[in-house]
UniProtKB/Swiss-Prot annotation:
EC id: 2.8.1.13
Function: Catalyzes the 2-thiolation of uridine at the wobble position (U34) of tRNA, leading to the formation of s(2)U34.
Protein name, entry field: tRNA-specific 2-thiouridylase MnmA
Family assignment from sequence similarity: Belongs to the MnmA/TRMU family.
Name of the encoding gene: mnmA
Length: 354
């Protein structure tokens, strides 16, 4: 069996490589996908991809495995970054990492390489099960690290080629393995935030592409102007961080895109404004549910799932009814559907209802 392993320079993908070698696989080649934007944005952040490659080189030498660097910066910019910028302009909250997996790691990568592989292995925290050539995507054992949310827009064809050997391991177990086999990157910290930014702050990325524009911050209940902000694109519904006003905490409740106004409420009023119903569209089903029971939804990456019912309306719009209120539902975000621990697929949030 011919196997390609995507190495990031981090501990997870390195342990994934070790796991495959331990299982006896020998025909292995590793790839590092260069998608960082630091070459373009070097003035606002450090450049971690050189450090990544140093670790990739060390790990591959340790296991005597060849590797190749694949440059996907142009593809990433055209297929993911432009999407994120357009969503921000519209006042939406994009999820670039979902499209990074769908369009780049398991999309453009296949197009770029000249070799064919039986299996693509990564260090993602998720599980793929195959029963009689019927593939399902499931949550990882480690529910805190689980990445099924970000894999929800893969196709069945993409999933059929993938293997995630870390799906049955906890992060603590992976760290332990890294120390036991003395990996060169055993003490390297986990990457944080959006996959292409590295050490660049998200707001700096937004500022670089969209600039700043002064606008008012208004208390939703009273209409009183409480302060100013530098552009609606820096804010998302439910956001608390960055609102530096007294008598808080304050939360973003609404955005007026045309007039560049951010509406906020304090914590007492904010907790009265949760939503139980919203519409989604552009659904990607990995496995469409046959029955409308035992379903749950994730509105954002994290452990929390909320039980729900779904109803298909015209034009393939779906109404989602949550069993409990959520306080940060924002257009442009993705709602991912689950049946127990199986990730069924996901859809883009269109608007909230009640």
């Amino acid at each position: 069996m011919k196997i390609a392993i995507l190495l990031s320079g981090g501990v997870d993908s390195s342990v994934a490589l070790y796991t495959m070698i331990q299982k006896g696989y020998k025909n292995i080649k590793c790839y590092y996908l260069k998608i960082w934007l630091e070459d373009e944005l070097s003035y606002i952040g450090e450049c971690p991809w050189k450090e990544d490659i140093t670790y990739v080189d060390s790990v591959c030498k340790k296991f005597n495995v060849p590797y190749e660097i694949i440059n996907l910066q142009e593809e990433y910019y055209n297929r993911v970054v432009t999407y994120a910028i357009e969503e921000l302009k519209m006042g939406n909250t994009p999820s670039p990492d979902i499209f990074c997996n769908q369009r780049i790691k398991f999309g453009a990568f296949f197009e770029k390489i000249n070799e064919k592989y039986d299996l693509i292995v990564t260090g993602h925290y998720a599980k793929i099960e195959n029963k009689n050539n019927s593939y399902t995507l499931k949550q990882a054992k480690d529910k805190i690290k689980d990445q099924s949310y970000f894999l929800s827009h893969l196709s069945k064809k993409q999933i059929s080629k993938l293997h995630f050997p870390l799906g049955d391991l906890l992060k603590s177990e992976i760290r332990q393995i890294a120390h036991e086999i003395d990996l060169p990157n055993k003490n390297r910290k986990d990457s944080q935030g959006i996959c292409f930014l590295g050490k660049i702050k998200y707001n700096e990325f937004i500022k670089y592409h969209l600039g700043e524009l002064k606008g008012n911050i208004i208390e939703q209940e009273t209409g009183k102007i409480l302060g100013t902000h530098n552009g609606y694109w820096f804010f998302t519904i439910g956001q608390r961080k960055g609102i530096k006003l007294s008598h808080g905490p304050w939360f973003v409740t609404e955005k007026d895109i045309q007039n560049n106004i951010i509406y906020i409420s304090n914590s007492t009023n904010y907790l009265k404004q949760g939503k139980e119903q919203f519409l989604v569209h552009k659904t990607n089903w990995i496995n469409k549910p046959l029955k409308n029971d035992n379903l749950s939804a994730k509105i954002r990456h994290g452990e929390k799932k909320i039980k729900c019912k779904i109803e298909t309306l015209k034009d393939e719009i779906i109404r989602v009814n949550l069993e409990e209120k959520d306080y940060g539902i924002s257009p442009g975000q993705f709602c991912i559907f689950y049946k127990e621990d199986e990730c069924l697929g996901g859809a883009k949030i269109l608007k909230t209802l009640i």
